[in-house]
Amino acid sequence: LIGSSFGAAVSVYTAGVDERVSAAISSGGWGDGERKFRGQHIGDEAWPAFTKMMDRGRKHREDTGEPLMVPRYEIVPIPEHLRRNLAPGSVMMFPADTAISMYEFKADNVVGQISPRPLLLLHSSEDSVTPTEQSVEMFKRAGQPTDLHLVADVDHFMFGEGNPRIITILKDWLEKYFPV
């Protein structure tokens, strides 16, 4: 099971709770929503604005029964130079409930249950979207066999960059655990 970013967090969580998953690959994933968001909404204004948005979302849902819609970049800030990696027509407004559920999401709590099945953690060494420490922490909590690769010269959307090093890491790992 493979995922990137939020999909990577979901792939790790799913592998941790479902033994039918034979292996997991996480690219730029995260294990603790609150810690991830604290690393993304840095500064005296950004973190309070983010937590107020979640509070407004909860109140709006309670008062109206409807979700409060917020711009995607208020949930996960993506630098301008990486926004071209989003597919044309991508959804740009999300319910505040999305931020709340991500904030509460903790793949860290189940990553250790993946073992003895293999886990591959890939992360940019200087990820401008998801803090690199998220994959490092999952590695610390994981059992074996787990491989962690922190890769220079790529950013958050490493599979979209066509970097041959990423392809080689992935190919070699798959050949090791799933020889043909």
Annotate each PLM feature.
Residues 114-115, 120-123, 127:
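Short beta-strand/loop motif that positions the catalytic acidic residue
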Residues 112-115, 141-143:
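Short, conserved loop/helix-junction motifs that constitute active-site signature segments
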Residues 128-134:
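Conserved alpha/beta-hydrolase "acid-adjacent" motif
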Residues 1-64, 93-94, 126:
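Primarily recognizes the serine-hydrolase "nucleophile elbow" in alpha/beta-hydrolase
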Residues 44-48, 67-68, 117-119, 133, ...:
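Alpha/beta-hydrolase-fold serine-hydrolase catalytic core, especially in secreted/extracellular enzymes
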Residues 63-91:
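Conserved alpha/beta-hydrolase catalytic His-Asp/Glu region
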Residues 39-40, 94-111:
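Active-site nucleophile elbow and catalytic-triad environment of alpha/beta-hydrolase enzymes
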